[in-house]
Amino acid sequence: MEVEISGARTVGSGRLCSKNSAMPPVVKNLMESSPGETETFRPLLDLPGVRLEQIVSNGQASAEGFWYDQKNPEWVLLVRGEAVLRFDPGGDVTMKTGDFLLIPANTRHRVEFVSADAVWLALHFQP
């Protein structure tokens, strides 16, 4: 079985192998991001049942009246910045650099506030 992982692949044993053995794996930096006017999502890992992405918020909170309500749990880590997540029910959760939390499946939530420099890691998975 082969699975794509950001320019590499796993092979039966689960070992990571370069697609071209003459070339080393490509190293990328999580903190490299372009400032912009919109929130950007960069996939880092995409496996069956598991997706890891970088989110650069660029100060973009959820649109007025918009709520996330996802069928699978999501674990989020605020790598840099500050944010306020609003849960329905549950109220607000204030986050700062280094804070993480697990959002259970089917939990209505939104980003009420996020700083312009905010960078997240979001892990979506099937339980």
Model features per residue range: what roles?
Residues 2-4, 8-11, 22:
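Acidic, Ala/Val/Gly-enriched low-complexity intrinsically disordered segments
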